[in-house]
Amino acid sequence: VYSAEADSLQGTLYYDSLSEEKGLTKNQEKDRFESFRDKIVLTWESKGVFVRRAMEAGAKAVLHICATKGDYIHHSNIGMIWGTPDFDEAAYMKFLPSAGIRRADGEALIEKMAAGEMDAEVTIEMETKIRRSSMVAVDIKGKSDSFVLVSGHYDSWYEGITDNAVSDAILLEYARVLYAHRSELKRGVRIAWWSGHSDGRFSGSTWYCDSHYADLRKNCVAHVNLDLTGCKNSEQIVARTAGSEGISYTADLIEKYTGKRPDVYIPMIRGADQSFWGAYVPITIMLKYEPLPEKRLSDCPSGGPWWHTPKDTIDKLDEKIMMRDAKINMEMLDDIQSAKMIPVNIPVFLEDLDGRLKKTLSGLAPEFDTTEICAEWN
């Protein structure tokens, strides 16, 4: 998503061989991007920052090689703006013509280019505009004004069974069950189905936070997000979390439902529609459902390589895993809504932050003076 249009754009094809390397020096990076001028760049890079730098370096277009083996091209997003752009962000809505190609096609082009210079022609049709979309939210009141926000995105690529139709169905069942038991709720439960997750860079949840900020800031005690649930081959679970509840909270639940206790958690990312940092929601959790290391089929964030492709179909659903994911998330949100005090463990949280800060500081060059940082933290 997000590309300039191109109508038979012609140019010399240039292979970005340094995209296979890591830890490039500043001089290597400088020479690398200078080589892109007036070229159609074939690369393994796919991030928006890279495409932006390629555009600033004078590249004509970018062709991203999908790293996944097989007949896959994962729909992705090179936009750098979170949500609907403001006027001062308009400059970042200018893009190069950019498209993805299959791994086999990319490797074939690399092989041909080794024999000599090649020209390429690129045609891309793209419509970029602000659209009106609908978002459904169910507000099930509890005995207090505080509530747990539970969410998932309903926009999908193609059929999108595991991303994110299964989660949407689970949320619908939550709404049915919780509404039937609404008289028993200590805190309310608000269930939201976001639009604009992929194509709008979390524009739905961003709009919701902007439009409901005061309520979220005052009353929302937790945000639990469901994404990629019920996916075949996703036998293990790791918690993505902001960490305020302490690792044992999610580890206990994960061990109960999988038999394996994780010894780490993954810091929260924006991909879980985490548009609520500024509203200071105390607890933020999205469980991550993964294959066992020996059964991993790809680097995709799901059970297999079908993520964001037309192959994310009903046969990728595992009903047993779906029920596991529905139960663990329901137990978590029910525990939070019914707790006398929300399960925030500040001593453990600060201990974890201390360890992460020390690890970061220990990796810095000795020329970087950390005295003031350490004094402030201590």
PLM-predicted stretches and their roles:
Residues 344-378:
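Acidic, Ser/Thr-rich low-complexity intrinsically disordered segments
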Residues 1-27, 85-162, 172-186:
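Soluble metallo-hydrolase cores and metallopeptidase-like ectodomains found primarily
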Residues 1-3, 15, 38-45, 50-51, ...:
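Second-shell loop/turn segments in exported
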Residues 187-190, 293-354:
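His/Asp/Glu-rich mid-to-C-terminal helical/loop segments that flank catalytic regions of hydrolases
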Residues 1-97, 262:
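Extracellular/luminal Protease-associated
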Residues 177-202, 226:
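Short helix-loop-beta-strand segments that form the rim/entrance of peptidase-like active sites
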Residues 13-16, 40-43, 61-65, 97-101, ...:
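Structural recognition of the beta-strand scaffold that forms the well-ordered cores
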Residues 106, 143-145, 195-306, 376-378:
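Metal-dependent peptidase/peptidase-like ectodomains
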